[in-house]
Amino acid sequence: MVPFDKKNLFLTGEDEAEGYCQTGYGVCPDGTGFVANRTYMPGVTVDMMDWWFPWHSVGSDLRYKIWDPKDHYFARADRAAYVLDPRVPMKEKTWGVDHYIMEDTGAGPEFLQLCFKRPSDFGYDESLVGKGKCASLVCAIGKSRIAAAMTHKWYPYKEGILFCSRFWIGFGWVDGRIVKTLPEGAEIPAKAARGLYHHSIEEFTNLAAILPDVYRENRDNF
């Protein structure tokens, strides 16, 4: 998979042209792990996905549970008033917001804090967002037993969108930067990467099936 320091290639789609993994998981020579996945979502639009990420973090816990009923328990934004503020553009409603989550990615229910970032704070070139193979995105640092950096991007594709995910496992937020936090000599267990990979496939396949109806019925019920 594309290395974290070359992550802008993911936004442009050049990582595929350069032969980096698009779907799979593994452990890198430095011990960090990776997960790559992409999901075709027919009937889903860019605007629907922009709406989904803030919408499911406020209001009823059911919003997160319907995403993946077997493995999702709750997701709660720490700045609900900001998320609900109609003056905040939809694409910015995750910026600087932490989601406190309970979910099961293969090792049993686990608490997770997802710290969402503005793309530039994550280290992305924001001029690449909103065009080509990155119509929109969300990016976050996950704090749990194992720290990870995460990006989901999406763009129009066929009769819907193509939703693409990347997880760099063993990277965390230190002094305002994202760096490798995995201790030297340590290695991410392959089963951890595999569990996250299978969970990603399941949750986004589920989301592709429900989002058009959920959006149609709730778009004005933020």
Predicted features along the sequence, with ranges:
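Short, solvent-exposed coil/turn segments at beta-strand boundaries
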Residues: 44, 131-132, 155-160
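A residue-identity detector for tryptophan
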Residues: 51-55, 67, 95, 154, ...
